[in-house]
Amino acid sequence: MLKQETKLLWHEWIKVTRDRCHLHFELEKNDLSFHIETCLKGSERTAQRISEDIKKEPKFILDIGSSVGFNCFSIAKKYKESKVFGIEPDEEACKVANSTAKDLGYKNIEFVNGLGETLPFSNNFFDLIISHTVIEHVKNVDKCIDEMARVLRPEGYIHIEAPNYIWPWEPHLSIFTTPLCSKPLMKFLAKLQKVGEEVSYIDHLQPVNPIWLERLFKKNNLKWDNRANTKYLLASVGETKDIAAYKNSSVFYKFFLFFKKIGIIKPLTKLALKLNFYPSILYTVKK
């Protein structure tokens, strides 16, 4: 599947990325093909959610924070007639992504080294912009949203998924926090929960939340649909497939099922949504 040159790029990237982020790719326990196959399955689920959400066929698509390209691969497979761009600040990741795309036979993908805060594209260029668990990692959230709005075409869409830091849980480090937790307090709580050297990872996190993002949407004259409302309301009446991801990783799912069992999940869900008190952000934004 992958040429030897691409495999070497992968292994070089894995060596340096351990010093840059929280991820440990389990490559010591599994081979590279296993890792790629597993990540592709996850990205295919993401692409499916986006295609269900965005009915319009996009011509030009941008994935912000594309890393080594998994979401772009699945999006390009879903939209075969589209041109897909991935932008990623990690130069080594871009090299891996471009080489992997070539080996896998993708003709409609291009990976660019750059930042979400200074997108190297003209105004009104993209029909669809994707920010999948990335906005909490950028240096300047406000500038990144401004740039998305600038390069998005009229009637174009932005798909945003991210943790909600009003919810008292930090998913990257798997620690309990407080609503709207400050970074110093988050570090303190991480140490109490015996997080080791990864505590420093908190320094580059941006504690995004619906209030912050909706203010930026309004500033840029964007319309938005808070898809989390639909997601959790449907779950409260029995459609739990969209929250099944929490099943093995969060007490949220256990509490959800308990409150559902005793018959108070509907009013609790409505109250939680009103207070923006839920685990993850999910927006469809339109220009």
Give names to the regions the model predicted.
Residues C39-E57, S74:
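Conserved alpha-helix/loop element of class I SAM-dependent methyltransferases that forms part
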Residues S67:
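Conserved glycine-rich SAM-binding loop
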Residues S131-V134:
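A short beta-strand submotif of the Rossmann-like class I SAM-dependent methyltransferase core
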Residues D142-Y157:
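A short glycine-rich, Lys/Arg-flanked "PGG" loop and its adjoining helix->strand segment in the class I
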